[in-house]
């Protein structure tokens, strides 16, 4: 009985790990499409960006966000009228 429970737990962990890897592969392929070389913003985290084609996730310094137009990390504009990623998120939350 104990072996069966251990087997089921191990099976569940392996299935979860594989599903998570499949999700990440799909997510990364959308951010860094085949043949694209350069930097691309993380769609879920203003502080992060990806180096394509290697799909390496990088982070800006604290208080900075990645700006796709200049492909650099810039200071965060906390003003809701700003054009940065964080300002857009604040505007979306306030609407």
From Swiss-Prot:
Record-level GO cellular component terms: extracellular region
Record InterPro entries: Chitin-bd_dom (IPR002557), Chitin-bd_dom_sf (IPR036508)
One example GO MF annotation: chitin binding
Name this polypeptide is given: Uncharacterized 11.0 kDa protein
Source organism (scientific name): Orgyia pseudotsugata multicapsid polyhedrosis virus (OpMNPV)
């Amino acid at each position: 009985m104990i072996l069966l429970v251990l087997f089921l737990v191990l099976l569940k962990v392996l299935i979860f790990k594989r599903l998570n890897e499949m999700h990440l592969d799909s997510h990364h392929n959308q951010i860094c499409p085949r043949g694209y070389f350069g930097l691309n913003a993380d769609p879920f985290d203003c502080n992060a960006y990806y180096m394509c084609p290697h799909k390496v996730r990088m982070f800006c310094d604290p208080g900075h966000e990645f700006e796709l137009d200049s492909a650099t990390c810039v200071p965060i504009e906390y003003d809701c009228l700003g054009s940065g990623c964080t300002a857009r998120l604040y505007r979306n939350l306030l609407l």
